[in-house]
Each structure stands twice: as structure tokens, then as C-alpha cells.
Amino acid sequence: ANAQNAEKEYLKKVLTNLEKIESATYYVTNESWQPGDSTALSTLHSFIKEYDNPMDSTIGASYVSLDANDTTKLEFCYDGNIRALPYHENKKLAIDDFTFRPLPFRLVSPPFFNHAKNIIRYALTTKDHIVTELKDEGDNYYFKLVIDENQQVEFFGKAYHMPLPPFDIGSTTSIYELWINKSNDLPYKKRREMSHDISVSTCSNLAINRHTIYDFNASDYFPKDYEIVKYSDLYKKKAEPTASSLIGKKAPGWILENIEAQPVSLADYKSKIILINFTGIGCGACQAAIPFLKQLKDSFTSEEFELIAIESWSRKVSAIRNYAKRKELNYTILNATNEVIKQYQTGGAAPYFFIVDQERIIRKVIRGYSNENTDKEIINAIKELL
């Protein structure tokens, strides 16, 4: 009981320190990991200007994320009313006011100190099923929060129990870890672990309370020569062809690398039917589809049917190799190129399933995955063509 009280008192002290932060500037390294991997899937270095924003009842903070190597280059901005997303390749800046496809929360990754503050506040006040641990590691304290609920818990400002998707996500346990520096009793590193995805953020060069929210104006960071567009227009204007417009057309040919970095061509495959699955490491629906796809591969002979996955998110051969090994894939997985994503018109979204007949005509296109429904749809389409 004494140890628990001491833990609680220390966390309250850290929370008080976090609540005193009106503004913070810092460099942050954000890593994305797959459970079981020994190397990060992606690593991003950013410079952050974070402001406490009591006027914003959703996230409770405003911030701008800039490229760590070029702090004039905007990566993301949120001011409590809008988020700004730059598309550097075509010099567009999308402004989202959250009225398009509204959700119960704002889909904004909270900045470091806002996130840490809400994690600790939740740990001290929640009635959810949680287990906490505080450990002295010399120069820092290590804090671990394990949330054992029927839904995963994410923080967009306060904690939200995430709606369960129409597929099995595995464990719904959520784990949050903080490393707290003893010199200032503030976190400098955090880790979030879900069944499908792990993210780690590490801060450096912290400066606190040099500015206030009144110094912050989002438009100061907008690139001057970019066209400003509404976020909703990026979706509404889709007069461009979509993947389903390929039905009845010849499947675009490709030569892509496998996990041994060897070239593989669509023309190499001689089976009657081919299922091409555009997938993404870190995509929950894609991972949920794997048991069915493995079973599907074993249900037909190689003369009848072939299954090829094309990894369109990570583009790192080592990550794809680890993924194939960890998931014990019994089918080929290839590394996508921008060209093949463009040809198949997926826009980088996943999962997509293209069912291709013996003449290599695309006969069916399915987007997304929902356990039994998608399984039946794919099996029926294959059997019809056989």
C-alpha cells in the first residue's frame, strides 16, 4: 500500500509539472514498429512547437510539426479549429475543419507533452481495468500502464475506447510506457503498444514556456507558394478512375522484388486464377485477413490458383521479410513501387483484392476486409471462374 501511495504521489507531481507547461519546443524522433520486429519500420525526425490550448475542448493543445532538418518545411499543423496537411509533391496544402466525415474525436495525433499528460491523468482517475508499475532506473523513472479492456484505448486529448472493427484485431490490451527524467520530473520518451502497431517517441532539446498560445498562428507556417484546398475536396473531386474501373480490363503487368530482393513478374505465374492482394504492414484489416488467405492458398492446386500479396506501405525489404516470417506466410509477398500502385489505382490504400482470370482480365475488385463477408465473396468469385 505504501509503494502504491508513493507511486500515486510521484505521478501527481509529474502531472502537476505537465500542467504547468504552456508551451514547449523540442526535437522528437518518432518510430513506428511492428510487434516482434528488431528494427523500426519507419523513423521520422521533427521539430515541434507545442502549446497548451484550454479553448480547444477536444485535444486541448495546438502544435506545429516541422522537418527537423529544415525547420521552414511544414509537416503538420493543428490550431484547435483546423488541421493543415501539406502535399509537397504537388504543392498543395489541405485544410481540414473536421466537418467532413466527422468522428466522435478529432483524428489528430496529440503532441508529446499533451499525450503524456492525458496518459498520467487517465492512470490516476480511470475506473477501467488497469495495472500500473513505476520503477526507479537511476537517472529516470520508468512508468508502465497496461489497460485491459474489451476495446483498445487511444488518446485524442482524453482517452477513447475505440470501436471494434469488423474483423478480429487480436488482443485488445493497450500498453503505454513513459520514461521520466529525474532532473525535471518530466517524461522524455513514450511508447504505445497495440496488437497491430507500436510507436515510440523520444524528445530532446526541450525548452519550456518561452511562448504562449497567443504567439501561435497556424497560417504563419503555411508554405507561401502552395495552393490551399479543402481536405474534403481531395475526396469529393475523385473524378479520377478508381480501382473498380479496372474490372473487365487486362491486369497491368509488373516486375517487383520479393523478400530476397529477386525480381518477380506477373507473367511468371501460369495458374488459372490469380488473387492480387495489396496489403500494408501495420494495417489491422490486412493482418486480420491473413489466416483466411493462408487457408485459401492451401485450398487449391497451383495450376488452379495463385495468391500474391503486394506490400504497399513500408517499402523496406527487411521489414517485409520479418513480417512474412512472423506471420508464417505460405504465399508470395512482393515490394510495391509507386508505379504499380498507380496502375492498380489503389491510392496506397489497403487491403485491396483483385481477382484475375486465365486471360489475365480483372474480374472482381474488393476493397477492405470484413471476416466472413469478404471470405465468402472471394471464394465464390474464384469458384465461378474455375
Model-derived regions, located:
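Conserved redox-active cysteine motifs that mediate thiol-disulfide chemistry
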Residues: K270, F278-Q295
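Extended beta-strand-rich segments in extracellular/periplasmic secretory proteins, especially
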Residues: F113-S183
